[in-house]
């Protein structure tokens, strides 16, 4: 265990220091590069390993060796700089299903000092347009199928091999990725100098009020994540199956950066299908899966069929994040798959992988825990009402601090000030406690995001749409528990007098305006929405009302 000040007295068991009410990580400290002009792509490429195959496309079998990967990164970066004109600080959007070339694009863009951002492929054209208006990308990497969702006249590089003529003339295609990968570099190596404090990545994190916000992550933030990833007890010869979306922080940090530095092989599924995943495990003798909790539940429910059809003897580890696993789910999985270890973790988009995780099956059997603090992370538990710092086994809002914590929100200083204080503490919005052994437990969400199958759904966005309906006076959206999805959006609606508005009409009204994962799936009508004196919706009262009928 390492501490920032020698004078601190820290309990070696819990990691807690009474003098400053701070919990410290019990893991080994990170070794970060002192060179302030070393970008994260260079840091990743400099890591020694003996890995040969970096990525495999599960659908086609196409492979990228590590030599192929770094050759492609160099060539794409050269094309972007000399032919497209991408420069330091420019924003490049990736709108694409999972692909073995997403890591190539991310690493190329960051090597130039440019910033990559992503969008959910399920989002509507309206939702994507709002994000584009905020981030103002210079260029978009996308597929022929997804290109029509983009605003007209935006520059596009196609990530598939479809011909130009199949696209509407309003879309300005400036390149095809497969051609960029084949093109020999120009030999002109002059590029903009990159500083570690420069922004490298901007992922959009949904908020409970107003529009989603672009989370700004620097080269230093991502370097800290990669350094932590390779320092964890991971086997370099692991073969991972990537089922999580690579437009999300989990997929990007793990499979576009972490495993590349580690030298592991990753088999990428373009989209998740349970039996496609199992087929990939058997075919490629995969040893590790990274999953969201609903997939774990599906594996339990279909265990007999899965084990009868597929050889999963190579599978050793399942890594699960997004929500704490219950004792019932953990025990149910271990009963069905006794030779597979479950490892859990906790992090936020704003923490870039910093948070907590379990690194052994024994730790994961401490039911409900997200693990112990990751390397170089400090934590505080704060009373959300008084602001008082709490101690061991006391519940309050979790604050995190460390080298991977985001710089803040893009063009939103107010939100940045509310979330990250002047000392660099990230207020997570999650109600947690840390026990006498330093294990973090997530009790509840102070933040009101609904997590549907790993996707974040902001209630305020759906409420804003609901009240535009001519027959709706007021509305509130809450998370409704579901065994398969984790949660789904449920609406409480106040109808106008004499209105005969039905549940189906409300559901249909919303479904036409949002991505599939944001759809409202249950509606209840109510006389009034319970609110505080200041007008804030009392969601907990509505959640209690909804779940009391279960």
Swiss-Prot record:
Name the segments for region: SBD2.
345-409
Q: Which UniProt keywords apply?
A: ATP-binding, Ligase, Magnesium, Nucleotide-binding, Peroxisome
Any one GO molecular function term = CoA-ligase activity
Q: Which annotated residues bind CoA?
A: 271, 453-454
CDD domains according to UniProt: 4CL (cd05904)
Please report which protein family the annotation says this sequence is part of.
Belongs to the ATP-dependent AMP-binding enzyme family.
Protein name per its UniProtKB record: OPC-6:CoA ligase
Q: Which organism is it from?
A: Arabidopsis thaliana (Mouse-ear cress)
Classification from the root reads: Eukaryota, Viridiplantae, Streptophyta, Embryophyta, Tracheophyta
Q: What is the gene called? A: 4CLL4
């Amino acid at each position: 265990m390492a501490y920032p000040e020698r004078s601190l007295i820290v309990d070696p068991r819990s990691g807690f220091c009474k003098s400053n009410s701070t919990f410290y990580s019990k893991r080994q400290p990170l070794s970060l590069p002192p060179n302030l002009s070393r970008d994260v792509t260079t840091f990743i490429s400099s890591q020694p390993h003996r890995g040969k195959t970096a990525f495999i496309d599960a659908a086609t079998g196409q492979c990228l060796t590590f030599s192929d990967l770094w050759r492609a990164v160099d060539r794409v970066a050269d094309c972007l700089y000399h032919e497209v004109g991408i420069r330091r600080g420019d924003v490049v959007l990736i709108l694409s299903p999972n692909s073995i070339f997403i890591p190539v694009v991310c690493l190329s863009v960051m090597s130039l000092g440019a910033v990559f951002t992503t969008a959910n492929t399920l989002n509507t054209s309206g939702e994507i347009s709002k994000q584009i208006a905020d981030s103002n990308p210079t260029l978009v990497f996308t597929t022929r199928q997804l290109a029509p969702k983009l605003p007209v006249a935006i520059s596009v590089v196609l990530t598939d091999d479809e011909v130009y003529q199949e696209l509407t003339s309003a879309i300005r295609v400036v390149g095809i990725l497969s051609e960029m990968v084949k093109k020999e570099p120009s030999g002109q190596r002059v590029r903009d100098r990159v500083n570690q404090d420069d922004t490298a990545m901007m992922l959009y994190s949904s908020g409970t009020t107003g529009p989603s916000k672009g989370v700004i992550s620097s080269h230093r933030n991502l370097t800290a994540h990669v350094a932590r990833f390779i320092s964890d007890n991971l086997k370099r010869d692991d073969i991972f199956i990537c089922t999580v979306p690579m437009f999300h922080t989990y997929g990007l940090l793990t499979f576009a950066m972490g495993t590349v530095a580690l030298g592991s092989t990753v088999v990428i599924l373009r989209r998740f299908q349970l039996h496609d995943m199992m087929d990939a495990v058997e075919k490629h003798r995969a040893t590790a899966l990274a999953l969201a909790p609903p997939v774990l539940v599906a594996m339990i429910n279909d265990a007999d069929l899965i084990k009868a059809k597929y050889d999963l003897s190579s599978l050793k580890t399942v890594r699960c994040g997004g929500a704490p696993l219950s004792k019932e789910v953990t025990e149910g999985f271990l009963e069905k798959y006794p030779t597979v270890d479950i490892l859990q973790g906790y992090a936020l988009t704003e923490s870039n992988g910093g948070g907590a995780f379990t690194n052994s099956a024994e730790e994961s059997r401490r039911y409900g825990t997200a693990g112990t603090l990751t390397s170089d992370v400090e934590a505080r538990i704060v009373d959300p009402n008084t602001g008082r710092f709490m101690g061991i086994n006391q519940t309050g809002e979790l604050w995190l601090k460390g080298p991977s914590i985001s710089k803040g929100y893009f063009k939103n200083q107010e939100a940045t000030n509310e979330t990250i204080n002047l000392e660099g503490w990230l207020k997570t919005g999650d109600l947690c406690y840390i026990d006498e052994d330093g294990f973090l437990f997530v009790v509840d969400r102070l933040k009101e995001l609904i997590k549907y199958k790993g996707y974040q759904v902001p209630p305020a966005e759906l409420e804003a749409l609901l009240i535009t309906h001519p027959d709706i006076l007021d509305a509130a959206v809450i998370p409704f528990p579901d065994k398969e999805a984790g949660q789904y959006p449920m609406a409480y609606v106040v109808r106008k007098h004499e209105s005969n508005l039905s549940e189906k009409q409300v559901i249909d009204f919303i479904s036409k305006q949002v991505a599939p994962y944001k759809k409202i799936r249950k509606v209840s009508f109510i006389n009034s929405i319970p609110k505080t004196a200041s007008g804030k919706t009392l969601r907990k009262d509505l959640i209690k009302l909804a779940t009391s009928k279960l």
